[in-house]
């Protein structure tokens, strides 16, 4: 009988501890979200192309060479 009472008290204490820990973790998460609410992510300049690509978007995508793109390459 004593073992059953001890087990019931232990289970109740563990449940209370989990609930209390969950509530405290929720408060910490809200504080962290309020702190991180500002501009955390900043744009990165990846040094993309500075000149216009040779050809239209279709030719670039499929590695084609339409007549307009060929004239542009040849300077005509």
From Swiss-Prot:
Source superkingdom: Eukaryota
Residues of the signal peptide: 1-21
Chief location category: secreted
KW Acetylation (keyword) present: no
Upregulating conditions: Expression is induced during host infection.
Subcellular location(s) per record: Secreted; Host cell; Host cytoplasm; Host nucleus
GO cellular component: a single term: host cell cytoplasm
Keywords annotated in UniProt: Host cytoplasm, Host nucleus, Secreted, Signal, Virulence
Known function: Rust effector delivered into infected tissues to modulate host functions and contribute to pathogen virulence. Enhances leaf colonization by the bacteria Pseudomonas syringae and the oomycete Hyaloperonospora arabidopsidis pathogens in an Arabidopsis thaliana infection model.
Stated family: Belongs to the CPGH1 family.
Protein name: Candidate secreted effector protein MPL124497
UniProt lineage: Eukaryota, Fungi, Dikarya, Basidiomycota, Pucciniomycotina
